[in-house]
Regions:
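The N-cap/first-turn positions of alpha helices
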Residues: 2-5, 29, 61
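A short LG(V/I)-centered, amphipathic sequence patch enriched
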Residues: 40-57
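Short helix-boundary/capping micro-motifs
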Residues: 10-28
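Hydrophobic a/d positions of heptad-repeat amphipathic alpha-helices forming coiled-coil signaling/dimerization
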Residues: 25-26, 61, 68
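Helix-turn-helix DNA-binding elements, focusing on the entry/boundary residues of the two helices
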Residues: 17-18, 36, 50
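Hydrophobic residues on short alpha-helical segments
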Residues: 6-13, 58, 65
Length: 84
């Protein structure tokens, strides 16, 4: 199961800073920036308001993160059940 998109968005929402989120995800800052920008283009809605280096969730971003966290929790429960 690959929930990379959800992990990236949730981590950026948690840290509010692209560089810190990228470090936590073990990817480069430019790679995360491009990924988030492309995701927002594909969704047709911004998930984050950018204020300098600070990233703040939009209303759509808040809804996205709410569902993404639920998906990540289900993934964890699934993995715990299957691989225990």
């Amino acid at each position: 199961m690959d929930l990379r998109e959800q992990k990236y968005v949730c981590t950026l929402a948690e840290y509010g800073n692209l560089t810190r989120a990228a470090e936590r995800l073990y990817i480069s800052q430019p790679a995360l920036s491009i990924y988030i920008t492309n995701l927002e283009k594909n969704l047709g809605v911004p998930l984050f308001d950018r204020n300098g280096k600070k990233f703040v969730l939009t209303y759509a971003g808040e809804r996205y993160v709410e569902k993404a966290r639920a998906m990540l929790q289900l993934e964890q429960e699934f993995n715990d059940e299957v691989y225990s």
